[in-house]
Amino acid sequence: NFLKKNNKSFEILIDVGAHIGETIELFSKNFFIKKIYSFEASPINYELLKKKEKKFIKINKYTEIVLENMALGANNTTKTFKQFNESSSSTFKKIDKNSKYFKKKYKLLNYFSKEDAYYEFDIRVQKLENYIVHKNLTRIDFLKIDTEGYEYEILLGLGNKISLVKILMFEHHYDNMIIKNYTFTDINNFLKMNNFNQIYKSKMPFRKTFEYIYKR
């Protein structure tokens, strides 16, 4: 609702952490968007995402959607990915299985064995900056990042192409389940240094996670 009050259309939207297309559906229904580049690191989640392509077209046939089974990060490298049975929690970050949040979450989701919560495999990671250069993008009207504790790394991987971003939306987890090597202050300082200002903040239901919107 906040975005709809202030924006009607976006030419280029980049969706990092597509999962199974929740952001694509939400934005296609509520905004005119010329093109969406949607990234999902997990090959398992990506297969589910691909199956919804026809549905996306029905929602808004005027929006071109590019789906990429690609992991993004701060460097071009290979990293271990944790594919959760509850797929929206999949992440590159280490997990504290002894944390209260982990135990509470998987008890509610009927995961009786902590060891079965996720399995691991390696994924190739590249910087978003490289993709932007490859596609010759000259503007990014809206960048959404939801990567379960890996948001800061995505931002660092933009390099100087962060100057192309007009509006940024991301989630930040304050719970102790995801072991991060940064704090919200690190992200906030980084964005301020790149001429962004926070314009919106909202707590997500039933969890210690906030959604933020910044604009330059």
What is each stretch, according to the model?
Residues N1-R216:
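Phosphate/nucleotide-binding beta-alpha loop and adjacent structural elements of enzyme active sites
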